Amino acid sequence: MSHKNIWNKHSRTYGKGSRGCRICGNRSGLIRKYGLSICRQCFREKSQNLGFDKYR
């Protein structure tokens, strides 16, 4: 039994383990609103390119 067989016994189709950032693949701090699916770190870098404006 290898390490992968122990921890990845079944595929993740729902929950936090199934989703990741479409830019870096990170699974924490994910912004899913408006179908973005981008982590908050990448959102801060790419928000101007996506058309979001900073008001403060």
UniProtKB/Swiss-Prot annotation:
Molecular function in Gene Ontology: structural constituent of ribosome; zinc ion binding
Cofactor(s) this protein requires: Zn(2+)
Cofactor binding note: Binds 1 zinc ion per subunit.
Keyword Translocase assigned: no
Positions contributing to Zn(2+) binding: 21, 24, 39, 42
Domain of life: Eukaryota
GO terms under biological process: cytoplasmic translation
Gene Ontology cellular-component terms listed: cytosolic small ribosomal subunit
UniProt keywords, alphabetically: Metal-binding, Ribonucleoprotein, Ribosomal protein, Zinc
Family the UniProt entry places it in: Belongs to the universal ribosomal protein uS14 family.
Protein name: Small ribosomal subunit protein uS14
Native organism: Guillardia theta (Cryptophyte)
Lineage: Eukaryota, Cryptophyceae, Pyrenomonadales, Geminigeraceae, Guillardia
